């Protein structure tokens, strides 16, 4: 006879679902639940057959003090479908914790982590057993849809071990988080988790009719662009990587360097052949090069994003993006990872961050597809030069800090332009400019790449770098670019020192830390020259997460009929009711919460007026000045 423990009596409980598939937002649902307790007890319950077990779970799970599992949000979504509710504010995910402990793993599956840290394994022979029963390859991907058809005894053996390993992994992680002093960043991820889960659950409304129309619009653009490419070439060109592109640009070699026929230096593949990838096409002056890039972009937007990611995932007028807080396993499969190592949120299904905010042509086609909740309006705010302001905080040059103190709304590129005498943005003919060198400093661009992007002289060199067995080619800045960089360092003291200090720390101890204590590691001492830039980016990502929490918690408390929608790059979007001055007052309070960071330089954001869709919201004038 089944035992039903009092789950609220335990400090933590591992709870794992067995489901008919992975699409909780469609028709898949749980058919079995396994638990594991700190006292060593574990059990599996087939809730299709055992009504008492289901009723016990429905009445008990919400009382669990701390529910733990691997990819916990998946189980939370699945259990909610059968009216079993997990407390999302206390639930803990071993997958998120694993990425805080080490962001460089090749796999974040439970099996992989159990082998690495616990010297234990899941029950893998279930795939062979299922293949014998139902046919098909003996892989997780092929056999997962057959789990609900498997004998209960087989599922019990498999599911209990999963719950037991998740609990053991959580217990090991408790000590490791303390050892690495990761408590602050883990608290941030815990605070964020309920908002991620709620955003996924409700989803984002989509204009399906407009999405289909956009496919037709993009097809016309692609066809027109291809015709123009073919006219310029004098023959038919396949815009995808192909021999016809090589024929069009006729690369030739002088010494060790490849050039396009217009004289543009281009890279070399590992096989020693000319590289005509995106970087080369951006540099080549022939008008067909830019059109090929445009054609590829439009094909990707049409086929991959709108047809695949959006229309392929609509359920009842909504898409339910998978939001990655950290790195994790890909789509519930064990075959790879997704997410970022710096902590920045990423979205899949659809990959919303792939809609380029600065590419107005694509944004104008795609963003109108996304709508606020029925009867509401979309509002949008974008942090002003967020990473550059964090960069200024760390570098702490007096001249820059004083300029921001005098006018918090200053444009950093213009500040640097005034200090160095450079133009703010790149002249049409190329050359040194403040915006490009700021980008280089924040993102640790090499001097040669900076020279290339500013159309200043550089050379190709070959060297073998630490930790690498084979030599590789790199761009080396010429004297003119080096002089520009030196001028920048003199005008803004502290920048070079912070970069050197971060690189030194990365080399000596193997990691650097963000303001929230997130560790960014450098295995084998590789790429330590990127350390300072990764600190800026990681700190910006942590602040973005804090901002989501501040906004979402304010909405829950003060205006629960509004809803936080998404965070892409440094943007925040909400679905709101137009209540005139009341809405503006709420937006001003959200602005205050976001800007209150206590840095040496002010953080700035303004929210715009309400609009019928995402794209129109980005064009609205600010109402929170």
Swiss-Prot record:
Residues 324-345 are annotated as: Disordered. This is DNA polymerase DpoZ. It comes from Salmonella phage PMBT28. Coiled coil: none annotated. It catalyses: DNA(n) + a 2'-deoxyribonucleoside 5'-triphosphate = DNA(n+1) + diphosphate; dZTP + DNA(n) = DNA(n)-Z + diphosphate. One of its GO terms (molecular function) is 3'-5' exonuclease activity. InterPro entries: 3'-5'_exonuclease_dom, DNA-dir_DNA_pol_A_palm_dom, DNA/RNA_pol_sf, DNA_polymerase_A, RNaseH-like_sf, RNaseH_sf. Belongs to the DNA polymerase type-A family. DpoZ subfamily. DNA polymerase that preferentially incorporates the non-canonical base aminoadenine/dZTP instead of adenine into the synthesized DNA. More efficient in using dZTP instead of dATP as a substrate. In addition to this preference for dZTP, the phage also encodes a dATP triphosphohydrolase that removes dATP and its precursor dADP from the nucleotide pool of the host. Pfam families: DNA_pol_A (PF00476), DNA_pol_A_exo1 (PF01612).
């Amino acid at each position: 006879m089944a035992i039903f423990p009092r789950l609220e009596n335990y400090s933590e409980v591992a709870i794992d679902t067995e489901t008919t598939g992975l699409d909780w937002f469609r028709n898949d649902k749980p058919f079995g639940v396994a638990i594991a307790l700190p006292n060593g007890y574990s059990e599996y319950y087939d809730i299709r057959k055992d009504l008492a077990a289901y009723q016990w779970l429905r009445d008990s799970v919400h009382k669990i003090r701390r529910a733990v599992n691997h990819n916990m949000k998946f189980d939370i979504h699945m259990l909610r479908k059968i009216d079993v509710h997990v407390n999302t504010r206390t639930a803990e995910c071993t997958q998120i914790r694993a990425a805080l402990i080490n962001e460089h793993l090749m796999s974040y599956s439970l099996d992989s982590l159990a082998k690495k840290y616990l010297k234990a394994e899941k029950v893998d022979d279930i795939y062979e057993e299922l293949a014998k029963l139902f046919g098909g390859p003996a892989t997780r991907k092929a056999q997962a849809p057959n789990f609900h058809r498997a004998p209960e005894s087989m599922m019990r053996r498999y599911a209990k071990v999963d719950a037991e390993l998740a609990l053991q992994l959580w217990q090991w992680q408790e000590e490791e988080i303390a050892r690495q002093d990761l408590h602050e960043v883990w608290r941030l991820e815990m605070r964020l988790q309920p908002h991620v889960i709620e955003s996924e659950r409700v989803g984002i409304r989509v204009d399906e009719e407009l999405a289909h129309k956009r496919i037709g619009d993009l097809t016309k653009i692609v066809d027109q662009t291809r015709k123009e490419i073919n006219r310029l070439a004098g023959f038919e060109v396949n815009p995808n990587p192909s021999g016809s592109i090589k024929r069009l640009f006729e690369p030739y070699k002088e010494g060790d360097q490849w050039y396009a026929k217009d004289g543009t230096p281009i890279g070399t593949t590992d096989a020693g052949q000319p590289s005509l990838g995106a970087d080369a096409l951006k540099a080549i002056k022939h008008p067909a090069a830019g059109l090929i890039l445009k054609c590829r972009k439009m094909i990707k937007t049409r086929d991959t994003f709108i047809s695949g990611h959006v229309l392929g995932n609509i359920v009842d007028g909504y898409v339910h993006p998978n939001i990655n807080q950290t790195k994790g396993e890909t789509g519930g499969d064990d075959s790879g990872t997704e997410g970022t190592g710096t902590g920045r949120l990423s979205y899949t299904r659809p990959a919303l961050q792939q809609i380029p905010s600065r590419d107005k042509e694509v944004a104008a086609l795609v963003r109108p597809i996304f709508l606020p909740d029925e009867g509401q309006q979309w509002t949008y705010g974008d942090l002003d030069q967020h990473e550059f302001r964090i960069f200024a905080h760390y570098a702490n040059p007096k001249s820059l800090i004083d300029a921001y103190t005098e006018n918090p709304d200053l444009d950093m590129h213009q500040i640097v332009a005034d200090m160095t005498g450079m133009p703010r943005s790149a002249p049409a003919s190329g050359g040194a400019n403040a915006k490009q060198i700021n980008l280089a400093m924040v993102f640790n661009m090499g001097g040669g790449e900076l020279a290339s992007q500013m159309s200043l002289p550089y050379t190709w060199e070959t060297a073998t770098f630490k930790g690498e067995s084979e030599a590789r080619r790199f761009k080396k800045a010429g004297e003119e670019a080096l002089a520009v960089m030196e001028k920048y360092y003199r005008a803004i003291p502290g920048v070079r020192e912070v970069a050197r200090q971060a690189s030194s720390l990365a080399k000596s101890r193997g990691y650097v830390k963000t303001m929230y204590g997130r560790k960014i590691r450098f295995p084998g001492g590789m790429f330590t020259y990127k350390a300072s830039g990764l600190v800026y980016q990681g700190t910006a990502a942590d602040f973005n997460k804090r901002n989501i929490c501040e906004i979402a918690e304010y909405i829950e408390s003060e205006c629960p009929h509004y809803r936080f929608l998404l965070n892409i790059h440094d943007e925040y979007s909400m679905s709101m009711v137009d209540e005139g001055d009341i809405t503006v007052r709420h937006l001003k309070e959200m602005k205050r919460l976001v800007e209150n960071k206590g840095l040496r330089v002010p953080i700035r954001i303004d929210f715009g007026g309400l609009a019928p869709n995402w794209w129109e919201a980005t064009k609205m004038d600010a109402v929170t000045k």
